[in-house]
A protein has these predicted regions:
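Short, Gly/Pro- and small/polar-rich lid/capping loops
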Residues: 1-10
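Acidic/His-leaning functional-site neighborhoods
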Residues: 12, 73, 78-85, 197-277
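Acidic-aromatic substrate-binding/catalytic surfaces of carbohydrate-active enzymes
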Residues: 13-67
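Beta-strand-rich interaction surfaces with strong enrichment in secreted/lumenal proteins
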Residues: 114-116, 277-282
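Active-site/ligand-binding surface loops and adjacent short beta/alpha elements
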Residues: 148-237
Length: 297
């Protein structure tokens, strides 16, 4: 049975469910910023993505170790995680999963994944993925976050979804691939951000083709904010090549900001797991750490 652990620092609180090691609340002075999982739109909050981000073609791939067969975004989000540490001051918590006979049927590699959530500032949550190769062959994988935030944000008064924008740290041009109807990624009909822009307005229609994926974002920083109030969230994701931005259908009142090291299979790729673009390869005994942080505005 899953349990929820709450960490605190001043007026900032975060709650994490051991099922999937998923963040389920992020509140400042009692004001909830994290999407609360209304199933009418999307029944999750902030799943962790491992050992894949997005989908494999037909949910399967071959590898040197055998067949990989798993659902969209991988296995970590759908299993119970062990609580291994809570800091003395109650401001951080670490969870762990390892491979099991069941996981090896879907992903035939040995691993350990530690997830640490830490409140590192008066309004900042830091999330760290630590992946260790516990096997004797190279471990291929991707990791990612999927936190979704309420739009409008707390304190936004009369703002609407259409009053929100994505702000970059400098002017920038980006061509973003889109998701095909069969769940693959393509540059055919890709989304192109306005040239030399540091602000991108969003509407519900921005997500008609699923997530928008930005590559090599300036400063590895992206801010989701209301144009009138300035309220929202800033995400810093150095070490993650991509940031996905997504909202659900039917005018869902949230936006997910998703740091990824990899992404769903491209329509031009083959079905060998190790060939997936930007897959991390970890030698036996090595550990890879990736961190992103969310600051509430």
């Amino acid at each position: 049975m899953s349990t929820v652990t709450t960490i605190k620092r001043g007026g900032l609180t975060a709650a994490i469910d051991s099922m999937g090691a998923q963040l389920t609340s992020l509140a400042l002075n009692g004001n909830e910023y994290l999407w609360q999982g209304d199933p009418a739109f999307w029944g999750k909050h902030a799943p962790i993505l491992f050992p894949i981000v997005g989908s494999l073609r037909n949910n399967t791939a071959t590898s040197a170790a055998g067949t990989c067969e798993m659902p969209r975004h991988g296995l970590a989000r759908i299993v119970e995680h062990k609580l291994v540490e809570v800091s003395e001051d109650g401001s951080s918590v670490t969870y762990e999963i390892t491979d099991t006979p069941e996981s090896l049927k879907a992903f035939p590699f040995h691993f350990k994944l530690n997830m640490t959530y830490a409140l590192t500032g008066d309004a900042t949550l830091t999330q760290t993925f630590a992946v260790t190769n516990t096997g004797d062959v190279d471990l291929p994988f991707s990791v990612g976050g999927h936190p979704a935030f309420n739009v409008p944000a707390p304190g936004a008064d009369d703002e609407t979804f259409e009053d929100y924008e994505l702000a970059f740290t400098e002017t920038w041009t980006n061509e973003a691939p889109i998701i095909t109807p069969d769940g693959l990624m393509t540059f055919e009909g890709s989304y192109k951000a306005p040239d030399n822009s540091d602000v991108l307005p969003i509407t519900h229609r921005s997500f008609d083709n699923d997530a928008i994926m930005f590559t090599d974002t300036p400063g590895s920083t992206l801010t989701l904010r209301g144009r009138k109030s300035g309220h929202g969230v800033k995400i810093d994701f150095e070490g993650f090549k991509y940031i996905g931005v997504w909202s659900a259908a039917n005018d869902a009142p949230f936006v997910a900001l998703e740091p990824w090291t990899g992404h769903t299979t491209m329509d031009t790729e083959d079905d060998v797991f190790e060939h997936k673009v930007n897959t991390i390869t970890l030698a036996p005994g090595e550990t890879d750490k990736r961190t992103f942080s969310v600051t509430l505005l």
